[in-house]
Amino acid sequence: MKKNRLLFRVIILLILCGAVGFTLYQGFFADKEKMQIGKEAPNFVVTDLEGKKIELKDLKGKGVFLNFWGTWCKPCEKEMPYMNELYPKYKEKGVEIIALDADETEIAVKNFVKQYDLKFPVAIDKGTKIIGTYSVGPLPTSFLIDKDGKVVEKIIGEQTKEQLEGYLQKITP
């Protein structure tokens, strides 16, 4: 009876060690697609609220301002009008602004877009897979991607209009 108990405990211990080892492996080594400053931005494909497919690799040759946000996020709400105001000017210069919502309902996101009359592409990161790939923590978080598809900078937190314009100038081709 004691041998069975000991064997059972050893088996449970091995299973736990295996689970911990697998978790550590996944966290540190498995995902080579993670975003790194100075490296090529991980590709993604989303469909915006207008039904248009957006694939990051198709935007090579343009600067990309990639913004992760949420409708509930007050700092996100404050910077959206600045992005909307600057979008036409920088779109003409070869810069795209893409806003990826953090997995909220389509109704909530559409209502927000309508309320602020947003003109730039807005999509929902369903399942937050892209957020994970880009190692996004607090919202808003934005990434500057140059014309060659490389990540130039990661910006965490709300931006003023002046800061945003400076970032857009930085990635203008």
UniProtKB/Swiss-Prot annotation:
It is a single-pass type II membrane protein. One of its GO terms (molecular function) is antioxidant activity. InterPro entries: AhpC/TSA, Thiol-dS_OxRdtase_ResA, Thioredoxin-like_sf, Thioredoxin_domain, Thioredoxin_ResA/DsbE_sf. Signal peptide: none annotated. Its main location: membrane. Residues 35-173 form the Thioredoxin domain. One of its GO terms (biological process) is cytochrome complex assembly. GO terms for cellular component: plasma membrane. Keywords: Cell membrane, Cytochrome c-type biogenesis, Disulfide bond, Membrane, Oxidoreductase, Redox-active center, Signal-anchor, Transmembrane, Transmembrane helix. Disulfide bonds join 73-76. Pathway: Protein modification; cytochrome c assembly. It is found in: Cell membrane. The keyword 4Fe-4S does not apply. HAMAP family: ResA. Belongs to the thioredoxin family. ResA subfamily. Thiol-disulfide oxidoreductase which is required in disulfide reduction during c-type cytochrome synthesis. May accept reducing equivalents from CcdA, leading to breakage of disulfide bonds in apocytochrome c; following this reduction heme can be covalently attached. This is Thiol-disulfide oxidoreductase ResA. It comes from Bacillus cereus (strain ZK / E33L). The lineage of its organism: Bacteria, Bacillati, Bacillota, Bacilli, Bacillales.
